[in-house]
Amino acid sequence: MMPLLLLILLSTRNLLGAAQSQESPVAGERRALDLTTVYVLPRSEPINATVEHKCREALASCYNGSEFQPLHDDGPIRPDPYRFSTMIRFKRSYGELPLPIELNDEFLEQLSLLHNNTDQLRVLLTLMRTSRASDWMSFLGGYTQCDAPKSVVFTCVESVCYEHDLMRLNYTTDLFTENVLGLDVSPPVLSVLVLLRNNHTKAESVVRVPTSSMSMLDGTYNLLRTILGHMSLDTDLIGVLRSYRDRFPAVFSVSDQIKITRQHYRPQYQRKRP
């Protein structure tokens, strides 16, 4: 099955290709985006007929380089600084000895994401759920007092420091409290692509956060079903869903498999005559 991220990128490419297929602008002249003939997916009417007007205005403003006003105060555009997704919830570790940290370019780039970052705590929690989690746990281990809880850390921006108990943060089940760019469906791993940014150092990076969330897999299935339905593709999605039992062993259990398929597929059983 095509990775979901690739599928979304292809859809975006169709949108940009349709917009760029119009007459080429004269050299030195910047044209305004014409949104009247843009099609995203095969359908009988332009996308304008079904897209809310504020979204069209935001797309045109972004393309034409004018000042952009966010439609919402939180979510992927501007995350709520006081809420964190359970996807990056801190998990206490026990009995693990600190290991030497591998100081390579990847670690130094991640370190630049933290330096004087006003959203330092969010970036730190996200990095602690990536493939370099053990390095960051070892790095933070030297900054706790002997009698301090292992879940307490300090963030410092411009020499002003704050204390945080990672076990008592305001966590929410809303995935899009973070800067989510997409989903990476690559069996046997299901990951969320998260954008990390430091406005102070102008550093940014996209990291993969592995997840074993059943609701995430269910949401991915529903999204694929919707996209394939718009494209009129004849795909046995139920069969694909059942194959996930073997392709995502970290996500599925027998009871979970029954739970996720029940709401999409209800087999009709015939009663046997006595």
UniProtKB/Swiss-Prot annotation:
GO biological-process terms attached to the record: fusion of virus membrane with host plasma membrane; symbiont entry into host cell
| Major place of residence | virion
According to its record, what are the GO cellular component terms? host cell Golgi apparatus; host cell plasma membrane; membrane; viral envelope; virion membrane
Tell me what topology the record assigns in the membrane. Answer: Peripheral membrane protein
Where in or outside the cell? Virion membrane; Host cell membrane; Host Golgi apparatus, Host trans-Golgi network
**Keyword Transit peptide among record annotations:** no
Q: What is the residue range of the signal peptide feature?
A: 1-21
Q: List the disulfide bonds.
A: C156-C161
What keywords sit in the KW lines? Disulfide bond, Fusion of virus membrane with host cell membrane, Fusion of virus membrane with host membrane, Glycoprotein, Host cell membrane, Host Golgi apparatus, Host membrane, Membrane, Signal, Viral envelope protein, Viral penetration into host cytoplasm, Virion, Virus entry into host cell
Residues covered by the gL betaherpesvirus-type domain:
51-251
Fill in the subunit field for this protein: Interacts with glycoprotein H (gH); this interaction is necessary for the correct processing and cell surface expression of gH.
Q: Which family does it belong to?
A: Belongs to the herpesviridae glycoprotein L (gL) family. Betaherpesvirinae gL subfamily.
Question: What exactly does this protein do?
Answer: The heterodimer glycoprotein H-glycoprotein L is required for the fusion of viral and plasma membranes leading to virus entry into the host cell. Acts as a functional inhibitor of gH and maintains gH in an inhibited form. Upon binding to host integrins, gL dissociates from gH leading to activation of the viral fusion glycoproteins gB and gH.
User: What's this protein's name?
Assistant: Envelope glycoprotein L
